[in-house]
Amino acid sequence: MSCILFTMKQKYIFFCVLFVMLVPPAAKGGNVVWHEGGAVTYTMQSKVSTVVTKAASLFEDDMKALTGNECYESNQGEVAVYQLDMASNKELKALEMQQVPLLKFIARKDAFWIGKRGNQVVIVGSNGRGAAYGLLELSRMSGVSVWKWWGDIVPKRRQHLEIDENLDKIEVPSVEYRGINIDDTQWSSGPWARNYLKEQLSDGLLGPAYYHKLFELMLRLKANTISAGWDKKVSVFLDVKGNREVADSFSMIVATPDHDGTVTLHEHKKPVDIKILYADDGYGYMLARSNDDVKQASHGAALYHLSYEGQPHDYLWLCTTQPGLVCSEMQTAYTCGANRLWLVTIHDPKVAAYQLNLFMDMAWDIRTVTPTTVQQHLQNWLGVQFGKQVAARLIKPLITFYRLSGIRRPEFMGWNEAPKAGVNPIFSNENKVNNTDFSAEEFGNELERYLNNYDSLSLSVLKLEDVIPDNLKGSYFAMVEYPIMSSAAMATKILQAQEARHIGRIASFHHDREALEPAARSVTVSYTHLRAHETDS
């Protein structure tokens, strides 16, 4: 009998184990579908700021690009959007009934809460910008890149949209004012605006059509402050009719420089002045403006360049500032008290896409990136643009690129200086191209090694182009290939010319194999590749 009972126990245990194996475990914070098929719908509270309607328009475009279906406002939307500083008592009570933690962020500027309540995704902003940021955060979480328009990043079509089942998060900015200074636009943004946006303005000025597109990007980046022509003219942004109005429609704050080392922010009727504590030296390294100011001020401003025009040398072509340097310097500035305003100078947002994204991510949440995690941040960013598999293969080439360009920016390869103001570059001794410090005789021929590294790098990014989807090849070229191939071509041009100048046997040059090998390095592939893309565009 005991033998039979033991057998029955074994059978019982066996079936229990089998049942546990077959039944899936309960989800712990898994994803749930918040939209499945048809049009995406959203509900808006009765009164909102204009910036929220601007964000809603972007959200509609995003959802249509994602799903292939229209997106529109509805009384029973899948997404509900609230703006606390304009909410009615009835709307506030409804949020309290849904257990939205209002007291934790209602008094924090630009903050928002996003969470799942029943069948709705609920977004609550403390003000208009906060609500706009929250709505566009849902776009990002659904698979839309910040660079959808500026970088031509086409979202991957999705049959359904998911969200974390336990999503319940508050986001509050680390830096109160997060801004862009658009400068030196005569080289890129100015001509582009004239050709494509049909803004016929004088050289270096940008109008409301350009700023409308820039402010859309800034909403996605969670920025809130704009300045223009910082080093050229105090009111260059306000000089153009319509700029102030479009800034107000996006709730953007206009910043102007003062001569006493402060920044004036025109947010309310009474301007706000903030002391500049740190500014970079033009090369990406932060310097304290005044030790006394740093000691006395607890909340100040930090200014940073991702493009630069002036002495000793410009860099207005490519953005090659190392991400690790941006991260380290801005964290230092924040820790030392420059935590109220961050302002970054660019001449074209598309050229500085990743570094600008990194800068604004840190301004929004200083904890999001550290010097030890910046590489993962870059890989994640690449994954959003081109997919995780491409990002995993692309991260090492980009690290190599930033290392090589960190040794010498492509704009600096002439080992010269920009001509002083008012001096014709043709007659400037400072502008003369000189031999570099790269040696062909020392350190195991570091000159050839530098060129070989660029050769290998160029080949790797060209091979990767084969796995890029056709609708992203243009974006891949602009964000990855062009900077790398152009930098490689510049290094080849300058360093091969240096090699040729050092050949002592000029008369026998064409019979000298040792001399011909470095001089005969072909840039045909690079040139043809760049020209082909130029023709296509």
Predicted stretch roles:
Residues 12-21:
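Sec-dependent N-terminal signal peptides
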Residues 29-172:
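Contiguous, structured surface segment used for ligand recognition
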Residues 150-203, 210, 216-229, 298:
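An acidic-aromatic substrate-binding cleft motif
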Residues 234-254:
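Aromatic-lined substrate-binding rim segments of carbohydrate-active enzymes
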Residues 248, 260-297, 451, 455, ...:
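Gly/Pro-rich turn-and-neighbor structural signature
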Residues 529-536:
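Single conserved hydrophobic/aromatic residue that forms the stacking wall/gate
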